[in-house]
Swiss-Prot record:
Gene3D superfamilies: 1.20.1250.10. The lineage of its organism: Eukaryota, Metazoa, Chordata, Craniata, Vertebrata. It is found in: Secreted. Produced by macrophages, IFN-alpha have antiviral activities. Interferon stimulates the production of two enzymes: a protein kinase and an oligoadenylate synthetase. Keywords: Antiviral defense, Cytokine, Disulfide bond, Secreted, Signal. Disulfide bonds join C24-C122, C52-C162. Coiled coil: none annotated. Interacts with CR2. It comes from Bos taurus. Its main location: secreted. Pfam families: Interferon. GO terms for cellular component: extracellular space. This is Interferon alpha-1.
Length: 189
């Protein structure tokens, strides 16, 4: 358990440093909100992942949307916004309230909302720059389709605790990938 916690902490620290280099000035509260989101997602785990092995599924995570070499900074911010928005919507459903503690979900939604606010301000700033490309439609569509597959899976599994555990792990993967995207841009700067 300690190595997993150490890895999570390392990803969080990378994220905090990396987000500041995306070309806009996100407040320190954004870094704290990202840290809170990952911590809260970890705390949501109520079912042992090993007991849900039969529920695993390949949701075809759109890694190319987060890792394409042609992705510009403004596009990266748009992808991060898209992932955060869909995560907020996913954990705002009635099905999520039936599985997890409402207080914990409220804290998660508050942290996600803070991230959305920061990213929206950043998007407005980036859109004002001359020649700033907007999100490629295929990246946006790939993220939307991914979250749609997660939603359909939850419906198919009738929002079972194991289904939510699988989805929770997928969302953590998406946030980890967004951290990697942020780190890639930090290294370029």
């Amino acid at each position: 358990m300690a190595p997993a916690w150490s890895l999570l902490l390392a990803l969080l620290l990378l994220s905090c440093n990396a987000i500041c280099s995306l070309g806009c000035h996100l407040p320190h509260s954004h870094s704290l909100a990202k840290r809170r989101v990952l911590t809260l997602l970890r705390q949501l785990r109520r079912v042992s992942p090993s007991s849900c092995l039969q529920d695993r599924n390949d949701f075809a995570f759109p890694q190319e949307a987060l890792g394409g070499s042609q992705l510009q900074k403004a596009q990266a911010i748009s992808v991060l916004h898209e992932v955060t928005q869909h995560t907020f919507q996913l954990f705002s459903t009635e099905g999520s309230a039936a599985v997890w503690d409402e207080s914990l979900l409220d804290r998660l939604r508050t942290a996600l909302d803070q991230q959305l606010t920061d990213l929206q301000a950043c998007l407005r700033q980036e859109e004002g720059l001359p020649g700033a490309p907007l999100l490629k439609e295929d990246s946006s569509l790939a993220v939307r389709k991914y979250f749609h597959r997660l939603t359909l899976y939850l419906q198919e599994k009738r929002h079972s605790p194991c289904a939510w555990e699988v989805v929770r792990a997928q969302v953590m993967r998406a946030f980890s990938s967004s951290t990697n995207l942020q780190e890639r841009f930090r290294r370029k700067d």
